[in-house]
Amino acid sequence: MAYLLLIGTRKGLFTARSEDRRTWEPNGPHRLDEADDAGMGPVYTIGINPHSGRLLAGTESRHFGPGVWHSDDLGATWTEPAEAPIRFPEDTEASLTRAWQFAFADDADTVYAGVEPHALFRSTDGGDGFTLVRALWEHPHRAEWFPGAGGGAIHTILPGTLGAGERSPEAITVAMSTGGVYQSADSGASWAPANRGISAGFLPDEEPEFGQCVHRVAAASDGSFYAQNHHGVYRSFAPATEGWSRIESGLPTDFGFAVVAHPHRPESAWNFPVVSQEVHLPPDNRLSAYRTDDSGATWRAVDDGLPRDPYFGIVLRDAACTDGADMPGFYFGTRNGDVYATTDNADRWHQVTAHLPDVLSVRAVEV
């Protein structure tokens, strides 16, 4: 097998390939449009359609604004539709700032896009065109959602699950900053918050119905969830509407951005701690990843192969992932431009590439 890693950075898209996930051949930056420098600005998110292999990239140009590009040959060539695929209807009086997340349903054609400002779009043609999910945009809570420090956006989309034992094709779970977790059981026709137990220490009511600054949610293989909140790491063992439990005991801090669930073992996940909301540095200025194999009851640092010298780059919410292989690989990139990989049967990280621009998004696939 071969493995493809896609790395979205502050200055364009980079890739890397490997046969063994230990040694890598990095490449880039890639011009998405060979005629000019399109795509050489930020690449905020990347999506890989597991059914068709189509790649989607959410970009931003200082001159042309936000863009969505797609590739049907694993990144060899890229196309931008003639008309913007994500457009707010005129009556909303809103405009796209950028795409934050792409997610794929169980069929090859249905794609979701989470964007800034807080909105969810759906495509039924593989990502060529998207339609606003009106019920979430028109939710009565929306007037009280507000931007987090990075902006106001839907950054997590998890089709097909509402929590453990709650899988269905009509289910969708989303998370946003700042607003919290919302779920739909009817393909987006109606939505309800699912934040019970998640704190919002910056609000007068520290456990409100909604308004939490959830940084990331990851779905485990049984449909249950892990969440990295603005403060606190959480697990939802039952349907998320029944509540969340804190699981950060054993981690050096309760703050961070990224969390990755094991694709086959629901008790296993990765977390990447950050000192605090004021200090965006790794704890003790040392780069490390933490793993649980018991649903957060305990955590252990996995830092073999990572820098021993003082390190100051952190992992952003979209910059860690798994390739989903039978023997899964796990990957992360930092704001210092370094990217690392490991496999489930190893406790050592291998450097994929170094000294890239600020890493914003990482995606991997077995090809």
Task: Name what the model sees in each region.
Residues 1-367:
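Extracellular glycan-interacting surfaces
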